[in-house]
Amino acid sequence: MSTTTRTLQAIKFDRDNIKLEILDQLLLPYSTSYIPINNIEDAFKAIKLMQVRGAPAIAIVGAFSVVVEVSNYLKQSDSNQKTIKNLNDSLNYLITSRPTAVNLANALNDIKQLLQKYNETDIIDEKIYQQIYDYAITLYDEDLANNKKIGENGLKYIIDTLTEQNFKGPFSIITICNTGSLATSGHGTALGIIRSTYQALQKNNSKQDFWLDHIYPCETRPYNQGAKLTTYELDYEQIPFTLICDNMVSSLINTLSDDNKKPIKTDQSAPVKFIIVGADRIVENGDTANKIGTFQLSTIANFFNTNRFNTTATATNKQIKFIVAAPKTTIDLNTKTGDDIVIEERPANELTTLVGPLLNESGKVGEKLTVGIATPGISVWNPAFDVTPHELIDSIVTEDPHVFTKDKNGEFNLIK
């Protein structure tokens, strides 16, 4: 199904007819098209091709695809019935579609845990199906509820931080990739905090002495999720924003700084006070894997905090707070440090080409084209993620009301 109607619903699951559809995010923002996921293989391809992306969303799609697959099992003839081993093999295969994001592995491992009470040779039956169905529904519903809690907790942290700093006036936020409704069951993580903050701290309705004036999403090369998806969501929600290239961040912060009188525009001169990012995996010590470019943002924030404006910066007076936002399902306590995170590498052509629709002079959308932008045959390194050291992270916001911050030794304690 393809339409021009805009939507932020990334996942459609028909609970009565057991049908799964996902919004093809490769076509956004110019076309809205849902594609069916009829089995685990369909889910693997959609996740691998990034038609659906975002750590929470791919976990939900993965779990729902298992429900659909098992539902299909029950419709097959007796001679072609599937066993627990067949399903476990399919789950192991699906986990490999995106190895860095822990949410997918966590969800599928939870399903495998449900199956442990059965023998590998047992036939999949209605009882097993119902357990998997109930798990997937709960995963979806809890993700949506947790995202709203993340938004609320992030808003409180922002208010507390600015109040403690005695900050007054407008401020801005930088974000990267897409961490909103399109990456989750709804509302979002980092973008969820931005949503909640803008709703509460607009200039005309803020009960504080400060207000959220502007968002700066990074385009997020090479897949451009920020340019394609985050701008789509911000525009949909009518939250003021300006798109920037990934390599403009330092210049932007300097231009918008309190001490610098060279604003881009008079209505966009609010200083950057927060950089808020999502996460695909947070390990025990707080090291965080997220979209490539996140580490770069944290080092920029650290530079401005320690070298540019606050030569004696402390935890309470830092100019720019670097916040990681994610559900607790993204926390991987089995991995000690970021050195042990497997980083997915994407195909070279994603870096050497651009894919998008042809636009005529009037802006009408035409056929999709692939355009080369680099010398053919060159060596390419294209990691999908990088790891931000916990030393460069100020706080980790989850659905837990307790926002994780570092102790006096500069360490996170995520085992709570």
Swiss-Prot record:
Annotated site residue numbers, Transition state stabilizer: C177
Any one of the GO CC terms: cytoplasm
GO biological-process terms attached to the record: L-methionine salvage from methylthioadenosine
Keywords: Amino-acid biosynthesis, Cytoplasm, Isomerase, Methionine biosynthesis, Nucleus
Function: Catalyzes the interconversion of methylthioribose-1-phosphate (MTR-1-P) into methylthioribulose-1-phosphate (MTRu-1-P).
GN (gene name): MRI1
Protein name per its UniProtKB record: Methylthioribose-1-phosphate isomerase
Pfam families in the record: IF-2B
Reaction catalysed by this enzyme: 5-(methylsulfanyl)-alpha-D-ribose 1-phosphate = 5-(methylsulfanyl)-D-ribulose 1-phosphate
GO MF entry, a single one: S-methyl-5-thioribose-1-phosphate isomerase activity
Family: Belongs to the eIF-2B alpha/beta/delta subunits family. MtnA subfamily.
Localization, UniProt: Cytoplasm; Nucleus
Biological pathway: Amino-acid biosynthesis; L-methionine biosynthesis via salvage pathway; L-methionine from S-methyl-5-thio-alpha-D-ribose 1-phosphate: step 1/6
Primary location recorded for the protein, binned into one broad class: cytoplasm
Organism: Candida albicans (strain WO-1)
Active site: D280 (proton donor)
InterPro entries referenced in this protein's UniProt entry, alphabetically: IF-2B-related (IPR000649), IF-M1Pi (IPR005251), IF_2B-like_C (IPR042529), Initiation_fac_2B_a/b/d (IPR011559), M1Pi_N (IPR027363), NagB/RpiA_transferase-like (IPR037171)
